[in-house]
């Protein structure tokens, strides 16, 4: 009798283990119920509101899995905060927004000059936002930045957003700036944050192509307020002082012919001792 009672207890225990192990799968979200945000743009709206733009791949596009460039979609929501904008966007989307694959976060210059600490804290506290997401301050609106970004080589725009900042290592024209680094500098008593400076290339005479966005320079902050910017040459000097650039090319005026420039390619002669 006692053995039979112990056997029943053992069977019940096994059943409870299976129930607890598989019950979470019923509450989890399937992949076909999610839509992944690739880029997040934040602009200043009217009446102290924010205009938040979400860019994501079109899951119904036939080119999403092919060799052609995958189609992207974007929606803009006006709300009092980023969290409210996400909640509002979910109310009319067929699928739930997921930010775990967001590669870049863009703030407009208009918003950044007023301070973005509240938005930074909101994003950092969101478990879906990766600290490695690039942060860009756009001289045009964040919505326009997203709309005009059209990679020339990469088929997947998510790959472009992930890779473009890596050119800082061999050009020095932009910093490697992420929201995680920005937040750490924001809470540091001896540091100041900085971000990638973005702009529409339609305002530039030096860049032409299908991608109408250029990322050149550094957006300089005092605490959470945008206070200035560095051009390409100043950015090279800034990154060189921080040992954050491997090699770079600069053009200097020819001292013997003021109409010409000399290109100087700078690389480390020896490895650093410290």
Language model segments and positions:
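Membrane-proximal alpha-helical signals and transmembrane carboxylates
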Residues: 2-274
